[in-house]
Design a protein with these regions (language model features):
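Glycine-rich dinucleotide-binding loop and its adjacent helix/turn
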Residues: 23-39, 104-107, 113, 141-197
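Cysteine-cluster motifs in flexible loop/terminal segments that predominantly coordinate metals
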Residues: 1-39
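Flexible loop/turn segments at secondary-structure boundaries
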Residues: 6-14, 25-28, 55, 77-81, ...
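Beta1-alpha1 glycine-rich phosphate/pyrophosphate-binding loop at the start
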Residues: 48-112, 178-222, 233
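Ferredoxin-like iron-sulfur electron-transfer modules
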Residues: 32-49, 54, 85, 117-118
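A Rossmann-like FAD-binding core segment of flavoenzymes
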Residues: 95-141, 155-156, 164-165, 171-172, ...
Length: 251
């Protein structure tokens, strides 16, 4: 998919990783093979709750091991955050994380797939599966953070948005500050997307670069080119001190 997490592993001096192939780098240490899976000697059922990348991968591995798998997703399509993020500028190829796994699961006779299935605890327990895998993801927080990356205060203003709100189309206002404490690709591409949609966007981050960790994936120059092309103002080594719903204080 071109995410370059593999080359980032080399830059970081850690074992190689791969978004598409979870066994990469673990062939010898854990004996994992990308295509050969040890069949279970105790056939049983598995319920996977959540159809994002992790849930799809868990269902696929369990099915290849010989389990009877049911995977349930609350939304009307598979893919979770990777499906949403693939709609951002330059991210379309990331959809293949979802596409391959959905296709592979659809070819297997021991897999049942259900969308629009919001399961609560009672429904999960009453389903009667021998094994349950919870892959329901997480939500972005609305908080102020210290320089040590510790949340110090909530930002409970209606004008405070997270990436989840961006994906859901809930962002309002014409002049927006994107405060990036994640430091990877998402803050930059969200700022780019909002600018493309006609917003006046300022990007701020405590790091020394916009989307600083993309240095590891060899993408940092492209981040700056995209933000400059869309007229996004960039402020690095800048922290968000407060926001009262009208004015943001940065320093």
């Amino acid at each position: 998919i071109g995410c370059n997490i593999c080359i980032a592993s080399w830059h970081d001096g850690v074992p190689v990783r791969c978004t598409q192939n979870a066994t990469a780098g673990e062939e010898w240490r854990r004996g994992w093979h990308p295509e050969k899976f040890t069949k279970t000697d105790k056939p049983s059922s598995v319920l996977v709750v959540g159809g994002g990348p992790s849930g799809l991968e868990a269902a696929l591995v369990a099915a290849r091991q010989g389990f009877d798998v049911t995977i349930a997703e609350r939304d009307d399509d598979w893919g979770g955050r990777v499906l949403k993020e693939s709609q951002l500028p330059g991210m379309a190829s990331w959809r293949r994380v979802r596409d391959y796994r959905v296709w592979a699961l659809s070819q297997m006779g021991n897999v049942s797939m259900f969308t629009n299935s919001d399961l609560d605890c009672d429904a999960i327990q009453s389903f009667g599966a021998d094994h349950i895998a919870l892959a329901t993801g997480a939500q972005w927080t609305r908080s102020l953070y210290s320089a040590l990356e510790i949340p110090i205060a909530p930002l409970n203003k209606p004008q405070v948005f997270t990436p989840d709100d961006v994906f859901a189309g809930r962002v309002t206002g014409d002049r927006l500050l994107v405060f990036d404490f994640d430091h990877y690709y998402l803050g930059g591409v969200i700022a780019e997307q909002l600018a493309i949609s006609g917003k006046q966007v300022t990007y701020a981050t405590p790091a020394g670069h916009a989307s600083a960790w993309t240095f590891m994936t060899n993408e940092l120059p492209f981040v700056y080119q995209a933000l400059a092309r869309e007229g996004v103002a960039i402020h690095t080594t800048t922290n968000l001190i407060s926001f009262d719903g009208v004015q943001a204080i940065v320093a």
